[in-house]
A protein has these predicted regions:
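Broad phosphate/nucleotide-binding scaffolds in NTP-utilizing and phosphate-metabolizing enzymes
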Residues: 1-196, 201, 214-221, 225-233, ...
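Conserved catalytic-loop position in the HRD/HxD motif
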Residues: 201, 206-208
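Short adenine-binding "F-helix/F-box" segment of the Bergerat
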Residues: 236
Length: 363
C-alpha cells in the first residue's frame, strides 16, 4: 500500500481498514459456543464480566473485552469456527503451486521456503502456541524502557486471553500522527525487529499497523504473536556482514558471502551492477545517520524494480532465498513498508551497527 501513489493510497488504505473493522462478527450464541468448547461450560465463572460485542477483528478471529475474575481488564481473542479448515485448504493450494514457482526460479529451493511458510501458518492456528510466544516476549521485555508486552491470562487451542492495553494504534498514527509520534513509532518498530532475535530467539512475524500501539510513556505495546520466526541463535552474522560489504561496495567479498549464505546459487555468474541494484533499497537507508522513510521513496524503489523486471527474472533463476530467512526477510520488508506509511525519520544506521550481528565486525 505504501508504494501506491497517495491520490490512490488514501482510499485504498481506508478500504482495507474498513474491511478489517467491518468483518462480519460472530453472533453471541456462536461466541458462547466456542468458549464452552475451549474454556469449559463454566467459563463465565472465570470472568467478572464479558462483552458479547467484539471490539476488533483479528486475522482469523475477533477480539472481545472482558474483566477477569481477579479484576484485570482482558482481551479475549476467539478464532472463527471453520477458519482452520479454510486456511488448510489454502495451504494445500499453495503446496500445489510449488511446481509453478519452481519454473520461475528453477535453481532455488522453493519447496523449502513453501514448507517453512506452511509450517508457520499452521502454528498460527493453535492459540496455545501463540500464547507461549507471547509469554516468551513478555518475559524477555519485562521492564524494558521501550516496549510493553501484555501478559497471558489463559489460553486454549482457539481462545487466548491476555491483559488489555489502552494506547494509540499505529494505524491511527499513520492517519493523523504528529511528526514526533511518527518518528518514535518508526524507530520503535525497527528496534523491535532488530532486537528481538537476540533477546528472545524469535522475531515478531506479523508487522501490521493493527498489531502495535504507542503508550503515553513512549513505549510501544506489541500484540498478536501468532506468527513468529524462530531464530534460536539470533540473526546469522553473515546477514549483517553481507549488508556491510554492500555498503562498503566490497564486491570481492560480497559475492562469495552471498553464495555462502545461499542467496546466490553456486556457479552462477552475477554482475556487480545487478547485485548493487538489488541491494540498493536496503543499503541506502544506512548511508546516512537518520533516514527519511516515505511513500515517495518507496514508490521510487518500486518503479526502479519495474524498470528492471526483465533483469530480475534473470536473477531469480540465479538466486535463492534461504528457507530459514524467508520470514525474517519478509518482516524486515514489512517494517520498511510500514515506516514508509508512517513518513518517519529513523536512525537505522546506529541500530544496524548495534543490533545486527556481523555488521560492525572488522572486514
Amino acid at each position: 500500500e505504501a508504494a501506491i501513489p497517495e491520490e490512490f493510497g488514501e482510499p485504498y488504505r481506508e478500504a482495507l481498514t474498513k474491511l478489517q473493522k467491518d468483518a462480519p462478527p460472530l453472533s453471541a450464541e456462536k461466541v458462547h459456543r466456542v468458549l464452552d468448547g475451549q474454556l469449559g461450560t463454566k467459563w463465565r465463572e472465570r470472568f467478572a464480566s464479558f462483552d458479547d460485542t467484539p471490539v476488533a477483528a483479528a486475522s482469523i478471529g475477533q477480539v472481545h473485552k472482558g474483566v477477569w475474575s481477579d479484576g484485570r481488564e482482558v482481551a479475549v481473542k476467539i478464532q472463527y469456527p471453520g477458519a482452520d479448515e479454510a486456511l488448510r485448504a489454502d495451504l494445500k493450494t499453495m503446496r500445489r503451486m510449488t511446481s509453478v514457482l519452481k519454473q520461475l526460479a528453477p535453481g532455488a529451493d522453493v519447496q523449502a521456503v513453501v514448507d517453512e511458510l506452511i509450517e508457520r501458518t499452521e502454528m498460527e492456528l493453535d492459540y496455545r502456541l501463540e500464547a507461549n510466544n507471547q509469554r516468551a516476549f513478555a518475559k524477555a521485555y519485562e521492564g524494558h524502557p521501550h516496549f510493553f508486552i501484555p501478559r497471558i491470562v489463559g489460553s486454549a487451542p482457539k481462545v487466548v486471553v491476555s491483559e488489555w492495553i489502552d494506547g494509540k494504534l499505529m494505524s491511527a498514527i499513520i492517519r493523523d500522527g504528529t511528526p514526533d509520534e511518527r518518528d518514535l513509532c518508526g524507530t520503535r518498530l525497527f528496534e523491535l525487529t532488530f532486537d528481538a532475535p537476540a533477546r528472545v530467539g524469535m522475531m515478531h512475524g506479523d508487522a501490521h499497523p493493527g498489531n502495535f500501539m504507542m503508550l503515553p510513556d513512549g513505549r510501544m505495546a506489541v500484540i498478536d504473536f501468532g506468527a513468529v520466526a524462530p531464530l534460536p541463535d539470533g540473526l546469522p552474522p553473515e546477514v549483517g556482514r553481507m549488508i556491510r560489504l554492500a555498503l562498503d561496495k566490497n564486491y570481492d567479498q560480497l559475492l562469495p558471502t552471498m553464495e555462502r549464505i545461499g542467496f546466490i546459487q553456486k556457479g552462477e555468474d552475477i554482475s556487480v551492477e545487478e547485485v548493487d541494484a538489488m541491494l540498493r533499497q536496503y543499503v541506502e537507508p544506512i548511508e546516512v545517520p537518520v533516514f527519511h522513510y516515505s511513500r515517495r521513496w518507496l514508490r521510487k524503489q518500486a518503479a526502479n524494480n519495474m524498470e528492471r523486471s526483465a533483469e530480475q527474472i534473470k536473477m531469480a533463476r540465479q538466486m535463492n532465498l534461504p528457507a530459514s530467512l524467508a520470514i525474517p526477510l519478509r518482516v524486515i520488508a514489512s517494517t520498511v513498508a510500514i515506516s514508509a506509511q508512517l513518513d518517519c525519520h529513523v536512525p537505522v544506521r546506529a541500530m544496524t551497527e548495534e543490533l545486527i550481528p556481523g555488521f560492525a565486525d572488522p572486514v
